[in-house]
Amino acid sequence: LTAVCLSLGLLTGCNVGDTKNYKQAAQDLEQGNYEAALEEYETAISEGVKPAQSYRGAGVAKLKLGNYEEAITYFNDALKCDKVGKALKKDILSYRAVAYLKVKDYEAALEDCQTLAENYKMDADLYFLTGETALAMDSYEEASANFEQAYGEDATYDRAIQIYGAYLNRDMEADGTRYLEAALSGTAKNAEDHCDRG
């Protein structure tokens, strides 16, 4: 069996250690070691290991490090790869929309949000992202509708804080306060939500 694995590795040009960098990168990313994750993902990319996932991971690391333009480039490269599954594409588009928001390319962020809405089941995170994009574009009613949907899907204290923060960033604190009040007046959804409330 070992001989078969080694011969397959030699035939494909990959060695057994190829996925080591990718796996370490995923672990580093999860632990918040973004510089290390980026380095490992770049090694995985250069070795051709899981290209779409590796580009996506490098993009997330760049996003977390505040290098938004470079993150967008990695996300674009990920989307160009063969075999980008539907779930992975949704994830990449979501992250790319966030990166576009960070560089204030609101039209591009909106385009990704629209693609997500057309091709995927909307969830609380997608509603929030779409609401945040609409708010950045001064589409207050659309933002409010999306935030309502996000909070309806995920009526937790964390979600209320997230929506409040989006409004606060636009000097619209009063609009966000109602989510905090609703979260505090309701019952906790789980132990973590109860703990978040103090």
Language model segments and positions:
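Canonical tetratricopeptide repeat
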Residues: 57, 91-95, 129, 162-163, ...
